[in-house]
Amino acid sequence: MATAPYGVRLLVGAATVAVEETMKLPRTILMYPMTLASQAAHVVMRFQQGLAELVIKGDNTLETLFPPKDEKPEWATFDEDLPDALEGTSIPLLGLSDASEAKNDDRRSDGRFALYSVSDTPETTTASRSADRSTNPKTAKHPKSAAKPTVPTPAVAAELDYPALTLAQLRARLHTLDVPELEALLAYEQATKARAPFQTLLANRITRATAK
């Protein structure tokens, strides 16, 4: 195949490129805003980075020309900064000294009044005994109180060995008792131990049995 002239090849190549760019034109138009935004963001970031580098260089230059002084605030004092005159001095503990003085005063006052208290002890004890005898003649004559009257044990209590029953055991046996037996147990409980849980249990059982 014969080679075409140079001018023809140039025109054909230009036409081909024009056709390809024309075919890419819709895609280029759609991507152009995104490309423009990314380029703008890149330019802004480069600008900020340049400003930061300039500031850092300025700080370094200022520190070189004007070195900072080691300043320490007045309130920042440490143990090693205190003068040597304070070494060896002791601070009196006011609370401990006051407490020791108060204890010494209490001991002295106890020692002073101990003689009077010892001398007055026999008289006060005899006076108190005579006063007790005069105010309580019945207790002196009858030191022992009268014993409580014995409560008769109902038959149902003796049958169940009621005094030895626990609350759970009594609850388990309530369904086998009728109303008179429950009332007898309640009266016996009130007259003897008067335990609130037992009284409540018996009273509730009597109420339910009566309602039936």
From Swiss-Prot:
Cellular-component GO terms for this entry: cytosol; peptidoglycan-based cell wall; plasma membrane
Region: Disordered, residue numbers: 97-151
Biased composition (Basic and acidic residues): 100-111
Organism domain of life: Bacteria
Recorded coiled-coil stretches: none
Name of the protein described by the UniProt record: Uncharacterized protein Rv1109c
Organism field: Mycobacterium tuberculosis (strain ATCC 25618 / H37Rv)
